[in-house]
């Protein structure tokens, strides 16, 4: 199976085009005001129309309420929902039933104890994303450029695909895939020149490096 490549937190037409034209499988739009990559739904919808059917559109939320999810699904019509907060397995199951969309659930990792929740989420999610656990004083749960110890995933055996994220860039994506044996990678800050400012060339370089790994 080809490596799943997701570029998350896209905010401009040119960076989105760089992602889809270079072959990203998934493009992520963030709906979380604390993030420098946050979009309003109208602008995300305009970017989504640019995608057409060239990649899967992913709506990333953090403990979103039903009203926000209703608006995102109705207007953006995403292919995937990604939950990056403290959503419970029961919440994931309920939302899948309501919208009929696949869900990718992020699990924050700092130590082996963080993997204890994995069986419960693997039973309800369609994909798992392992990301670095943020510092306690962080205002957002991801996109911070921090990595976790990839060796913690040694021995993880899931029946569904999983992706890794956190501190990954074109220079280390091959190593991340080798160590974790993940089916895919998700990048945000690793293709930015400053928080929220993605660079088309960095996006292209990352996708090519992931494909070559």
Swiss-Prot record:
The protein's matches in CDD domains, at most eight in alphabetical order, are given as: PRAI
Among HAMAP family, the record links this protein to: PRAI (MF_00135)
Q: Supply the InterPro entries for this chain.
A: Aldolase_TIM, PRAI_dom, RibuloseP-bd_barrel, TrpF_fam
Q: What is this protein called?
A: N-(5'-phosphoribosyl)anthranilate isomerase
Which keywords appear in this protein's UniProt record, sorted alphabetically?
A: Amino-acid biosynthesis, Aromatic amino acid biosynthesis, Isomerase, Tryptophan biosynthesis
Positions in coiled-coil regions:
none
Catalysed reaction equations from the record: N-(5-phospho-beta-D-ribosyl)anthranilate = 1-(2-carboxyphenylamino)-1-deoxy-D-ribulose 5-phosphate
Kindly list the organism's lineage: Bacteria, Pseudomonadati, Pseudomonadota, Alphaproteobacteria, Hyphomicrobiales
Recorded GO terms, molecular function?
A: phosphoribosylanthranilate isomerase activity
The source organism is Rhodopseudomonas palustris (strain TIE-1)
**Disulfide pairings:** none
Catalytic EC class: isomerase
* Known pathway: Amino-acid biosynthesis; L-tryptophan biosynthesis; L-tryptophan from chorismate: step 3/5
